[in-house]
Amino acid sequence: MNAGKEFNYYTYQSDSSQGSLQKAPDENTDYFTHKMNSYLPFDMSTLYANQPTEKIQILQEIYDTERTYVKALTIVDEIFIQQLNLWCPKSKKCFRSMFGEISAICKTHQILLESLQCKPIAEVFTKFVPFLKLYTSYASHYPNSLKIFAKLMSRNDFRKALTKIEEDPRVDGKKLQTYLIMPIQRIPRYIMLIQNLMNYSTEKDDMTNLYKALSGMQGLSDQIQSCMTAYENGERLLQIQLNFGLDGHILEPGRVLLKEGMLYKRELNGSANYQETVVFLFNDILLYGIKRISVMPLCKYEPSAILSLRHCIVQLDDIGGSIFIRCGDVGVDFTAYSLGGVTEWYNEICDAIDNAKKLRDTLRKESFKQKSLIFDKGFWQRNRDKLRNMITADMTGNISRVLTRKKPAPKLEESDFLRGQWTTSTIASNQRKRKVATLEDEEEDVFNMLSSPNLSQRKRKATLQENTPSGVGWTASPRSSSFRKRRASTLRNKNADVTDGNNYLSHLVLNDVTMTQPYTGLNAFVGTPKSRTPTDDDYDSDRDYVWTDDEEFVSDDKKIPIRRVASYDEEDRRPRDFSEVRRSVASEPPRRHLAVDDIRKLSYQQRSLEPFNMVTEDDDEDDIIDIKVKGERPRPWWETESAPPAIKNQKSSIIDSIRNSCAIM
């Protein structure tokens, strides 16, 4: 502690008999006490000696209430605000919103209190009315201040600090809420005191100034009331918008809620079916919907339609006790529990329509441009699509790959084929590679044996029959027997050399079998076949020509040929059979196991993504979401039966968990 603070901390204002020093009050306490003592009492009779006693009493009441009010504002400004900012520094932003302009109001009324001691009261109020517009901002944010106060009370540090401040004797035992509501009550108190003062005033100038002050106070009070009403109306509009689960259309500038209640909507086909409907009447639109049972606390209603009042035609049926409203292509028939309720709603709607048409002439921009906005099943369908997109985006990459199968499949290369298209096991692909390498060695041995000059004709024929190419990727052709006869007759020539053997293998063997792989090691041994011009065998003369629409004869030079379909399937590279039955591949190695992983992923994707629980009983069968990929093949029975029971039963649990965490409707 330095010398200055130590000197201020102790004082020698003590009795002469006591030698010890007394502890001085704190600096803040001295400043607050000095400021509170500066608001001295004042006798208004000294300033208005010639006035009646009743008028002096009213003037004295104005000054005394103003002095008490300024003291209360000083307590809030000097004790509550400063101490809370000191003990709860993390909540300073909340404190600024909670107290608002109360510090500026306090300084204004301090000057007003000093002016009442030396100037006529009518002149003072006339001069200070423009500065009292600070109450408009404070009053409009007062409901929000109460919400912030309730939120801060949930914090432990704020409660402890507030309790210590309220226990301070300088606060006079009042709560913080009592001080916050004082500015709201002050303006009506001014109006009442000025009206009482005008009853005892006789001078013309004094009456004129008092009337100006009274008019200014009444205008300020009306402005404060309108601001508070607008704030409450905005809060109510936002609550209605959230209750219907909408992102807009309700909370708009200038929109006011006029009436709300429950009506019964009757079907227009004449049947006696009534549906309980909640109706909200605004100054420019009419909103109605039905109650919905939902786990979410906000979404209480399901919107049916929004009607623009300027385009509505209303008819009252006194006999049937109903109101018929038509807006464009929308027509609705409402009734109430009693006939008096129907008449009351009819009068309110008619008055709102008349006012909307009158106000429209002075508006440059309309808040609701459409005649009617119908929230049909398509509205909820779009929300279901949003939910489905969110679910799809959160899935793994494997399911995303299945969803993108509608795109054209890329052309497979040799490496892609050797790995296998659908088989997930690397053992099968490695076995296929080893089989191809073994087949290359066998063909090379056969070629060496055939080209040997010491080989007899019988042994050559037997060797060729035993080593006919039949293995992975080879399929025997139906014409194999005829080609074998020609091959046997060709090999009878004892002078066959290596060139004839190469020509034989390139022209006869390749035509004899069908290759299902685009390229293997056999091509290096056999040699690449030479390019030739297409023949008649490459086309189908009966089916592959395109005829004109009038079916006239087209000459051969004008016919448009169509290539045959590839002899192998683009998906798993198996040979294609045009009778929709796949032929078995000759000497194909047995698959290690079925592609269970891929089948489970596909089954899980098709069983879990479709939000069945979101489809209500009112939806038609055509409205059910179908997320089946376009161009997808029908699923075989083994894929359907291979999904484990845990994945099958997981459909409802996933959607229920999503519905408990999302609220898009």
Curated annotation (Swiss-Prot):
Domain of life of the native organism: Eukaryota
Region listing for Disordered, in residue ranges: 456-489
Gene3D superfamilies membership: Dbl homology (DH) domain, Pleckstrin-homology domain (PH domain)/Phosphotyrosine-binding domain (PTB)
MF (Gene Ontology): guanyl-nucleotide exchange factor activity
Descriptive protein name: Putative protein tag-52
Gene designation: tag-52
SMART domains: PH (SM00233), RhoGEF (SM00325)
One GO cellular component term: cytoplasm
InterPro entries in the record: DBL_dom_sf (IPR035899), DH_dom (IPR000219), FYVE_RhoGEF_PH (IPR051092), PH-like_dom_sf (IPR011993), PH_domain (IPR001849)
Domain DH: 54-227
PANTHER family named among the record's database cross-references: FACIOGENITAL DYSPLASIA PROTEIN, LD03170P
CDD domains noted in UniProt: RhoGEF (cd00160)
Disulfide linkage: none
